[in-house]
């Protein structure tokens, strides 16, 4: 399945074609190659020790959240409605993958529910079942917003934190699922999945204002804050797709995997409830 989705090919191409163009710190790539037909892939990246690795289970501090939002905003601004996007046709877009994700969601919903039935909040269960017929419509809706490159899996487990004495302050890895779509989709994913509910409620508004302000400072125009907030809420609903498909396909049966799933479901449930996301679904 992973070969069919071309995840490894995309990551190798990202390090070769996109990483040299950006200011956002990524691990230095010493070698990368892929053979799609044989299913063989290799990527040799620099060792970032002794930098601190983010931990999705533990959750995000205010300082790390602020840094993560500022850095991804600058990355998004660099490709905002850029002509360079047309040359990156190997990166999937929201509209072109809408039907694929619709099918994957329906295919993986039952395996997902079977794995998490003991820890899935009832509100999230209802939304997950109702969302089964709405994935493509939500993704097509998001494709109408200004486009940039999304990381696609922007969360603490994919972040390495340095110090002022031994920088960079943030290095981002795991570029297997970049997407072309609304940048704030990365923000919705990060805030919903990485920040515990109480902390999110206290910091969410400020983080979104920070994200929008950095976009504007970097030259983004024609995108007002109300549009950003609308896309944020819709993107958060879309990310239920990511949870269902990933949990359905992958093995989270070890101790940390189980803790990760519980933490992410708890955070997602609170975010969905606070933002009343069920009202966004057609029908």
Label each region the model flagged:
Residues 10, 63, 67-70, 107, ...:
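Generic recognition of stable, solvent-exposed alpha-helical segments in well-folded globular domains
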Residues 134-183:
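Active-site acidic catalytic loop and adjacent metal/ATP-binding pocket
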Residues 13, 177-220, 236-256:
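Active-site activation/catalytic loop segments of kinase-like enzymes and analogous catalytic loops
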Residues 77, 87-138, 241-244:
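Active-site catalytic-loop/activation-segment of kinase and kinase-like phosphoryl-transfer enzymes
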Residues 33-36, 47-49, 154, 163, ...:
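Short, flexible loop/turn elements at secondary-structure junctions
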Residues 220-236, 268:
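All-alpha amphipathic helical-bundle segments outside canonical DNA-binding/catalytic cores
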Residues 234-283:
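ATP/Mg2+ or Mg2+-diphosphate-binding catalytic cores
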Residues 1-104, 183-184, 199, 221, ...:
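Conserved ATP-binding subdomain of kinase catalytic cores across diverse folds
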């Amino acid at each position: 399945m992973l070969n069919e989705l071309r995840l490894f090919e995309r990551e190798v191409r990202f390090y070769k074609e996109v990483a040299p163009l950006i200011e956002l710190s990524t691990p230095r790539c010493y070698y990368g190659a892929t053979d799609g037909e044989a299913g063989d892939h290799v990527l040799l990246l620099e060792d970032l020790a002794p930098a601190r690795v983010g931990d999705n289970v533990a959750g995000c501090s205010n300082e790390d959240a602020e840094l993560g939002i500022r850095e991804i905003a600058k990355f998004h601004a660099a490709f905002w409605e850029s002509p360079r996007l047309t040359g990156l046709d190997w990166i999937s877009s929201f509209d072109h993958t809408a039907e694929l994700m619709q099918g994957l969601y329906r295919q993986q919903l039952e395996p997902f529910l079977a794995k998490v039935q003991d820890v899935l909040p009832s509100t999230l269960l209802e939304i997950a079942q109702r969302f089964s017929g709405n994935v493509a419509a939500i993704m097509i809706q998001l494709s109408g917003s200004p486009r940039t490159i999304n990381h696609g899996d922007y969360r603490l487990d994919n972040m390495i934190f340095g110090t002022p004495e031994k920088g960079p302050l943030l290095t981002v890895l795991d570029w297997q699922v970049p997407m072309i779509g609304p940048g704030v989709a990365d923000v919705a994913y990060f805030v919903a999945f990485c920040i515990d509910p109480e902390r999110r409620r206290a910091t969410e508004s400020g983080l979104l204002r920070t994200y929008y302000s950095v976009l504007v400072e970097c030259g983004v125009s024609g995108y007002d804050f109300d549009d950003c907030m609308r896309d944020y809420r819709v993107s958060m609903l879309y990310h239920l797709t990511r949870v269902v498909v990933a949990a359905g396909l992958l093995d989270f049966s070890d101790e940390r995997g189980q803790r990760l799933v519980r933490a992410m479901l708890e955070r997602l449930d609170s975010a969905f409830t606070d933002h009343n996301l069920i009202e966004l679904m057609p029908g």
